């Protein structure tokens, strides 16, 4: 019979405590359960090696707390200096790297480096634009196309042009700038990235007009409506224009005068004066004609802009309402995206750069990442090519005081070598800082592991990767194994799995803190096989 202790509440505890008196019989699976409770834990292994947490638990730099807290400013890929360049003279860099090679980590490090540069040189700051969320722009482009093309992702991506990408970059840049001026969220209050109020006050009227015009055209915020943000910015800039209201004032005054005259003429005893009443509608039409002409002219302009601004959703009526707040003299001959060509976009980019220079940002850097993630791309190499290739134009890549950091999947490098002479003459990749293969050597991966272990170590501890293994596993073999895994993500996955498998082999009563070479080799083979299948 089983003895059941009094006061047992949990059914699991009741089951486990129901052991036979005298140990005549004890189910095998319960013995295994007891053994599992005594298995050596990962934390015991880490504590023995003076580690406070597992350095290899995270594989994605976006969520990797060890990287963000300790390694972001001290552990770099060997190609780091070529990619980052000189922040005082922004330049383009093109990186081709496989999944897990560290492109996202490099993006975060670039952002950190630019922030540090801006703190050190407040008069030579760099305006950073993150261009890594393509879904909203591609969705708007898809809706602008004919119905027969909307259902085909290849046709949508094939229709992309350089000016579409420039519109998206201008939208990102203008939206960020307006956010910082209006201080719409806490992230815009970072001193290294904020816009000083005295610099805003020093803008001349032409620059204020340019900023408002860029806002009306490109602002694409999720925190407020376009009209609300435009009005708030106009108030902040103290931009007052009376000329646009003159046609309305003339029309209202003329209407009031016409009503008075019609009453006067109708009361007149003279018959011929009464006939003049019929001329008043023509006079009213003439009085309001100036306003009507201006309304119609701006409405046509708004329609042209909305039609050719394919990566943003714009309402012609709302845009017309904003454009009519500028005088005709201030609006005439200003570049607007009212045709499908890149010249207008370069002129608008230069206007944005001049504004940024006056606000303390003489340089501008755009970081392009995650080109494999948009819904229309879905990780397909051919579609990634259609998305990225329009950006590879030397006129943009070598634009003055402007740099693009393109962090691209390694699959795209295959297409580079097979492109036409015309493509290479347009892109001039020989003039860009190209990292053709974002590879890691075994030694570099070893140093990366060591730095992460030091970041997770107890105070005054100096752990080494070699401390994990038995003496029969040589350092040469360990580095060669790391080389075969090629990327940090694969290495972290391998080491995490290796520690887990090692702990499963031993009980807490008889722990072993050195990993055997046979387990090392077998786990390595499994991880390599899984990587080949992906």
Named regions from a protein language model:
Residues 98-101, 131-134, 369-376, 409-412, ...:
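An acidic- and aromatic-residue-enriched active-site/binding cleft used to recognize and process polar
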Residues 12-134, 140-151, 224-253, 529-534:
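Walker A/P-loop-proximal flanking segment of P-loop NTPase domains
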Residues 16, 29-48, 73-77, 114-117, ...:
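The catalytic "switch" region of P-loop NTPases
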Residues 210-250, 277-279, 310-311, 459-534:
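C-terminal alpha-helical "lid" subdomain
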Residues 8-10:
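Intrinsic disorder/low-complexity segments enriched in small, polar and charged residues
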Residues 1-4:
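Short hydrophobic transmembrane-like helices used for membrane targeting/insertion
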């Amino acid at each position: 019979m089983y003895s059941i202790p009094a006061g047992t509440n949990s059914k699991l505890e009741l089951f486990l405590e129901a052991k036979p008196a005298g140990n005549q019989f004890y189910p095998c699976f319960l013995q295994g359960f007891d053994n599992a409770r005594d298995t050596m834990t990962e934390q015991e292994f880490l504590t023995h090696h003076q580690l406070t947490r597992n350095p290899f638990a995270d594989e994605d730099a976006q969520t990797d707390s060890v990287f963000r807290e300790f390694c972001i400013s001290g552990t770099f890929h060997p190609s780091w200096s070529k990619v980052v360049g000189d922040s005082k003279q922004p330049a383009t860099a093109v990186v081709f790297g496989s999944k897990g090679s560290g492109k996202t980590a490099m993006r975060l490090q670039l952002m950190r480096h630019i922030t540090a540069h801006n703190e050190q040189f407040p008069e030579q700051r760099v305006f950073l634009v993150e261009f890594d969320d393509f879904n909203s722009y591609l969705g708007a482009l898809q809706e602008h196309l004919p119905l027969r093309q909307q259902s085909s992702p290849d046709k949508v991506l094939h229709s992309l042009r350089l000016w579409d990408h420039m519109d998206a970059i201008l939208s990102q840049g203008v939206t960020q700038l307006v956010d910082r001026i209006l201080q719409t969220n806490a992230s815009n209050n970072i001193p290294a990235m904020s816009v000083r109020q005295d610099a805003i006050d020093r803008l001349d009227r032409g620059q204020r007009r340019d900023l408002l015009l860029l806002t009306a055209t490109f602002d694409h915020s999720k925190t407020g409506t376009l009209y609300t943000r435009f009005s708030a910015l106009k108030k902040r800039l103290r931009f007052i224009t009376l000329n646009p209201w003159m046609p309305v004032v003339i029309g209202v005054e003329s209407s009031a005068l016409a009503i008075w005259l019609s009453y006067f003429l109708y009361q007149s005893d003279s018959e011929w004066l009464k006939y003049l009443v019929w001329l008043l509608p023509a006079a009213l039409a003439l009085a309001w004609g100036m306003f009507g002409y201006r309304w119609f002219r701006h409405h046509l302009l708004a329609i042209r802009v909305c039609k050719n601004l394919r990566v943003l959703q714009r309402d012609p009526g709302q845009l017309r309402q904003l454009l009519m707040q500028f005088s005709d003299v201030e609006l005439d001959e200003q570049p607007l995206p009212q045709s499908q060509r890149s010249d207008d976009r370069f002129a608008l980019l230069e206007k944005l750069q001049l504004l940024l220079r006056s606000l303390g940002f003489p340089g501008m850097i755009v970081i392009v990442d995650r080109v494999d993630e948009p819904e229309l791309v879905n990780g397909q190499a051919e579609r990634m090519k259609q998305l990225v290739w329009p950006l590879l134009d030397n006129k943009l890549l070598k634009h003055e005081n402007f740099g693009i950091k393109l962090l691209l999947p390694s699959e795209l490098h295959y297409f580079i070598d097979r492109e036409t002479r015309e493509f290479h003459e347009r892109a001039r990749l020989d003039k860009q800082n190209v990292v053709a293969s974002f590879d890691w050597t075994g030694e570099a991966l070893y140093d990366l592991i060591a730095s992460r272990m030091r970041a997770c170590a107890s105070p005054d501890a100096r752990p080494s990767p070699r401390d994990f293994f038995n003496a029969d596993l040589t350092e040469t073999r360990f580095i060669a194994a790391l080389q075969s895994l090629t990327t940090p993500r694969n290495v972290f996955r391998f080491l995490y799995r290796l520690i887990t498998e090692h702990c499963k082999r031993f009980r807490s009563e008889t722990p072993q803190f050195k990993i055997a070479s046979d387990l090392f080799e077998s786990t390595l083979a499994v991880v390599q096989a899984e990587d080949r299948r992906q």
